[in-house]
Amino acid sequence: ADWSQYPLADVRAFSIDDSDTTEVDDAASVVHLEGGRTRVGIHIAAPALGILRDDPLDKVARARMSTVYAPGLKTTMLPDPWIKAFSLDEGRAVPCLSLYVTVDDETFSVEKTETRLERVSVTRNLRYDKIDSLVTEEAIQSGTLDVEFADEICWLWRFAKKLQKDREEVRGRPEPVGRVDWFFALEGEGEDALIRVKGRRRGAPLDLLVAELMIFANSTWGLWMEEHGTPGIYRSQRMGRVRMSTTPGPHDGLGVLRYAWSTSPLRR
């Protein structure tokens, strides 16, 4: 498809996923502005631009609802050719819905947001399993982090800490620390493949960075859709009960006024 009608963003974007991720939904960018401000870009793949309502592909995606992960098996929501066409793989300019956030460098407070439909060329697909052990709080705080996009990662981590602090004040309790999310990883192919159990530290710098940017995007777009009367799929939580609905509501567990499912369009 020809997406040349959409402007090409002037950013150096990068994504952070596992090495076996084929559906790269999101990426980020950082541009330092004059006057002590920084513009954060949260770039989300936009496969809906190439899918017509009620055509066969739309019906398949709606029937599957999400990508299914199982040990040794992954069934994707979208067919492989469509994933390859819209995945934010490095070196390709693909259509994105971008949320730009202007942030004060001193306080890390959000001054304004802007949403654009554009093309984004991802410079690098970074991988958790390659750099997660290197990206520590100690390395960030001491200025010794030595990975690609180190400056951007350090800045975004500090911004993410501010976003997390704001949410914790709303929800009235801190995020749990030290939790490990366990998952199955397939190494090799065919009958000789090995299934290994691996863990990811919740709250580790890279995990925190990605999680907070996605929560912020989903919260911002949820409020935006509500203001404009646009239908959406919302996740809310009141009195401990989590609901999925087309009616917006607060999410007490996350500490946000609205939370729309917007940031994983290739997978759900």
Residue ranges and their predicted role:
Residues 1-268:
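Electropositive polyanion-binding surfaces
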